[in-house]
Swiss-Prot record:
GO MF assignments: ATP binding; ATP hydrolysis activity; proton-transporting ATP synthase activity, rotational mechanism
InterPro entries xref list: AAA+_ATPase, ATP-synt_VA_C, ATP_synth_F1_bsu, ATPase_a/bsu_AS, ATPase_alpha/beta_chains, ATPase_F1/V1/A1_a/bsu_N, ATPase_F1/V1/A1_a/bsu_N_sf, ATPase_F1/V1/A1_a/bsu_nucl-bd
Protein name: ATP synthase subunit beta
Gene that this sequence comes from: atpD
Subunit details: F-type ATPases have 2 components, CF(1) - the catalytic core - and CF(0) - the membrane proton channel. CF(1) has five subunits: alpha(3), beta(3), gamma(1), delta(1), epsilon(1). CF(0) has three main subunits: a(1), b(2) and c(9-12). The alpha and beta chains form an alternating ring which encloses part of the gamma chain. CF(1) is attached to CF(0) by a central stalk formed by the gamma and epsilon chains, while a peripheral stalk is formed by the delta and b chains.
Family membership noted in the UniProt record: Belongs to the ATPase alpha/beta chains family.
Amino acid sequence: MIKKENLTYGKVHQVIGPVVDVIFSESKQLPRVYDCLSVQLKKSELFLEATQLIGDDIVRCIALGPTEGLARNVKVTNYNHPIEVPVGKNVLGRMFNVLGEPIDGKEPLPKKPKLSIHRNPPAFDEQPNTVDIFETGIKVIDLLTPYVRGGKIGLFGGAGVGKTVLVQELIHNIAKEHSGLSVFAGVGERTREGNDLYYEMIQGGVIDKTVLVFGQMNEPPGARMRVALTALTMAEYFRDHDNQNVLLFIDNIFRFTQAGSEVSALLGRMPSAVGYQPTLAIEMGKLQERIASTKTGSITSVQAIYVPADDLTDPAPATTFTHLDAKTVLDRNIAALGIFPAINPLESTSRLLDPSVVGINHYKVALGVQNILQRFAELQDIIAILGIDELSDEDKIIVERARRIRNFLSQPFFVAEKFSGIAGKYVSLNDTVQSFKEILEGKHDHLPEQAFFYVGTIQEAVEKAKRLNQEFDKTK
């Protein structure tokens, strides 16, 4: 409970859309920047966040909810602390807004524990000086774009290419294989997408290990700008107090920047390049620096990134890129082939794909896979015009192996079992590297290409080939 003596009071002085000026003419103590204030409306309570001081007694605030019905001289309460949100095991399986209020219609949460959404990143001496690979159990990711524990991954993909299913599978694997937790931040999300995700997680059986936090597209920019911090605060508690490995999803990180730009314009700040806020790099840095590992736990972040007009030099995505450790690109052309996850193995990259980190064996296999797929892509035009028979014997072998590799990069997901009818597979990193190594060495050139579709390890592909041969023999 907040003690009454800690509260101070002011009055609404001016309302300009989501910007509210509050005057504290009778109070000696003014709110500090980031302090939380509230106004009691007829049917609800409106929360504000102090952003700057104007003159001797006026505080300019950003509303975290709709300001309709707000009038001058209405009483404003200053809580003398930043926004605090619930944390701990009680938040698992629940859905929240930016203020940490449940929006899933279930029972209210206990009043404690709570934490401020404005926190410092882990101290340098608390962070480990080693680089650990975060094993996802998804072959194409672990082999070609390995994730770093406590790192930041950019997820690029349009609608309908399997982004949500990939996110759900990552949540499933960290929960089942690593006993970890996941926090999902919907920043500027469409309400429909958030609703679909919630029910899909219930059906996929991963909701009990997940927290959902939404600042929807129809909400004021103040709410959309702070919702990522709300989710991050919940993830930090699991990392610091429960020593957990946490997966943090932010969809979409561009909306975080966009909301900051709107707030900056409303506050009258001079715009910077392409109309973005002058504080873009600082705001992004404050968020990204808090996503880190400590010696007892970690937060690994997967951030969906929208690129305006496909311009990678736009300040919003360009500022995000500087913080990323890996880039995962979902490709519609690969999805059209029926290969899921539809990750482009040539456009996706990771700074961890280095022999000093992953080991020389893993590095050589990954490089070999990329080289064959690159050569296969170069030969596509020749095959389309002249046909495969016009290729040299060496190129024919490359094409056949590339097709097997391309098919083998597909994988049945646990969360997709209900509509695919294929049991999900978690493939260890060692099995992944060994399987692709055998394909590169030509040990399985005699197997049909169909045997490599939607299997886990290479042993499963061999067994599937035997079944296919038996079925073929029966049809004779």
